[in-house]
């Protein structure tokens, strides 16, 4: 939450792209991040292919009105890294998720980080 607070305080947009059902995604986000203003929160939606299809990223780009070059896709799985590759955005794998580091490394993300605050170092270089 502190990372997301800091990103927003610095004027950056944050969004969620999940393969969980839309209603479940919204419920989890509302519960765990009640004070974060997400630009978009997308879960599994009828008629929209799930990740690693890049459609969810493209939908977020439209809503956020930004280009691919302005995105840091942060995820904890190989599917997330594949999604970033397919969407042609910068990828950042995190090691504190549900998948092992080796799975992330398989997809050669632009970054692999071990602590949330490392996102700030990447974004504000």
Q: Where is each model-derived feature located?
A:
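Catalytic-core regions built around general acid/base machinery
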Residues: 2-11
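Short secondary-structure boundary segments
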Residues: 19, 95-97, 116
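Short, glycine/polar-rich helix-capping loops at beta-to-alpha or helix-loop-helix junctions
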Residues: 96-106
């Amino acid at each position: 939450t502190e990372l997301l607070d800091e990103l927003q305080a610095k004027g950056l947009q944050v969004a969620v792209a999940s393969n969980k059902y839309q209603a479940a995604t919204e419920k989890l986000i509302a519960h765990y991040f009640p004070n974060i203003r997400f630009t978009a929160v997308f879960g599994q939606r009828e008629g929209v292919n799930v990740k690693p299809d890049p459609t969810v990223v493209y939908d977020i780009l439209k809503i956020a009105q930004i280009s691919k070059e302005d995105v840091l896709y942060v995820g904890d799985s190989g599917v997330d890294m594949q999604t970033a590759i397919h969407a042609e955005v910068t990828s950042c794998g995190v090691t504190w998720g549900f998948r092992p580091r080796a799975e992330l490394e398989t997809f050669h993300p632009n970054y692999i980080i071990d602590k949330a605050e490392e996102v700030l170092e990447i974004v504000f270089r």
